[in-house]
Amino acid sequence: MKGSTVHTKWQAYCRLMRIDKPIGSLLLLWPTLWALWLAGRGIPEAKILVVFVLGVFFMRAAGCVVNDYADRHIDGFVKRTASRPLPSGTISEKESKILFVVLILLSFGLVLTLNSMTIWLSLAALALAWIYPFMKRVTHLPQVVLGAAFGWSIPMGFAAVSESLPLVCWLLLLANICWTVAYDTQYAMVDRDDDLRIGVKSTAILFGQHDKLIIGLLQLATLLLMVAIGWLMNLGGAFYWSILLAGALFTHQQKMIAQREREPCFRAFLNNNYVGLILFLGILISYW
């Protein structure tokens, strides 16, 4: 019985950290890899690569924990989130706070192996991870904060590799924010009815009937910014082909969200993993 209880608890911790749902980690990983390869104009130093990849998974897990802690009193009223560990009582509030601290300490321990510029930038990453879950209570634009949080590994990556923050770094961050707002609006469309009922704010609610158009414009902005980055970095044809393929995926996503149905909107959100992967492959091949 004791072994069964331990197993159940472990499963609950894994669910709290979304280990069973890696899509968030992947959407955080791709822009991190974009930045590391662009900053180093090719394969980055092995130590830096390992630190950032591990950091992605630790910080994403920490972000999920603080998100669920912030939403612990409302998740029980949303069909998709009612069974999460905190609202269901499988994990206590104290246990979630301890887990968050452990994950942050692990992440900061990794950052301490890098240069001082990266260490200072990591403090902003922590602040963004902490405040994002609470933004949906005060603004209809929490997705913009999420974009900054998911993209903050970009200036950190440039700082770690080159100890500089060039124009390309900020263009890449802006592209990632546009992309994140687009795909997280798709995600928010899944919960829009529940969010309206319980008073949670999101871009899906703010954009209303213009949601598909604005998502399309954000996707276009992402692609145009990527073209500018390719030109500034003198990337090869493979990168521009990857932009075209990403555009094709965005077009496919528009078809999926056309009727604003929950399941297709969620599939459109998941499809963004391939966008990030394809753009990374374009950068990778350009420096081959």
From Swiss-Prot:
Topology relative to the lipid bilayer, per the entry, is: Multi-pass membrane protein
Cited CDD domains: PT_UbiA_COQ2
Q: What is its main location?
A: membrane
* Function text: Catalyzes the prenylation of para-hydroxybenzoate (PHB) with an all-trans polyprenyl group. Mediates the second step in the final reaction sequence of ubiquinone-8 (UQ-8) biosynthesis, which is the condensation of the polyisoprenoid side chain with PHB, generating the first membrane-bound Q intermediate 3-octaprenyl-4-hydroxybenzoate.
PANTHER family cross-referenced by the UniProt entry: 4-HYDROXYBENZOATE POLYPRENYLTRANSFERASE, MITOCHONDRIAL (PTHR11048:SF28), PRENYLTRANSFERASES (PTHR11048)
Q: What is this protein called?
A: 4-hydroxybenzoate octaprenyltransferase
**UniProt catalytic activity:** all-trans-octaprenyl diphosphate + 4-hydroxybenzoate = 4-hydroxy-3-(all-trans-octaprenyl)benzoate + diphosphate
Give GO BP annotations, semicolon-separated.
ubiquinone biosynthetic process
Q: Which PROSITE patterns match?
A: UBIA (PS00943)
The UniProt entry's sequence similarity note says: Belongs to the UbiA prenyltransferase family.
HAMAP family linked? UbiA
Membrane-spanning segments = 23-43, 46-66, 98-118, 141-161, 163-183, 213-233, 234-254, 268-288
Does the record carry Mitochondrion as a key word?
no
Source species, domain of life: Bacteria
